[in-house]
Curated annotation (Swiss-Prot):
PANTHER family: HEMOGLOBIN FAMILY MEMBER, HEMOGLOBIN SUBUNIT ZETA. One of its GO terms (cellular component) is hemoglobin complex. It comes from Stercorarius maccormicki (South polar skua). GO terms for molecular function: haptoglobin binding; heme binding; metal ion binding; organic acid binding; oxygen binding; oxygen carrier activity; peroxidase activity. This is Hemoglobin subunit alpha-2. Heme b binds at H87. Involved in oxygen transport from the lung to the various peripheral tissues. Red blood cells.
């Protein structure tokens, strides 16, 4: 459960993400593909080379979806319902992959935000991204 302080930190840090959605998203995906190569199987039609337009475009979609979740911290289930349906019923993505991408996104935040990425921010984002992963996994049950 996100506390009021967690929500405040998430909103503050998200302001620093704005304008970098495509870069941060692409970097998180590339990190995931390198660290967890099995995740590439969900993208057989993508050019998985560094900086490809497809990775950049999908990365932007991912981070934009996270931004929509940030705007709806008190109602993540509703905010992510369509994405949950898409990933569960159409794409059939193994839910463990949401956690893997979350870890990679945390690394991207830490790299780019430097001293602003405090232990408190890390903890808040860990809770937030875990909640997002849980919501995206709801339809699998």
């Amino acid at each position: 459960m996100l506390t009021a302080d967690d929500k405040k930190l998430i909103l503050q840090i998200w302001e620093k993400v704005l304008g970098h959605q495509e870069d941060f998203g692409a970097e998180a995906l590339e990190r995931m593909f390198i660290t967890y190569p099995q995740t590439k199987t969900y993208f057989p039609h993508f050019d998985l080379q560094h900086g490809s337009d497809q990775i950049r475009s999908h990365g932007k979609k991912v981070v934009t979806a996270l931004g929509n979740a940030v705007k709806s911290l008190d109602n993540l289930s509703q905010a992510l319902s369509e994405l949950s349906n898409l990933h569960a019923y159409n794409l059939r993505v193994d839910p463990v992959n949401f956690k893997l991408l979350s870890q990679c996104f945390q690394v991207v935040l830490a790299v780019h935000l430097g001293k602003d990425y405090t232990p408190e921010v890390h903890a808040a984002f860990d809770k937030f991204l875990s909640a997002v992963a849980a919501v995206l996994s709801e339809k699998y049950r």
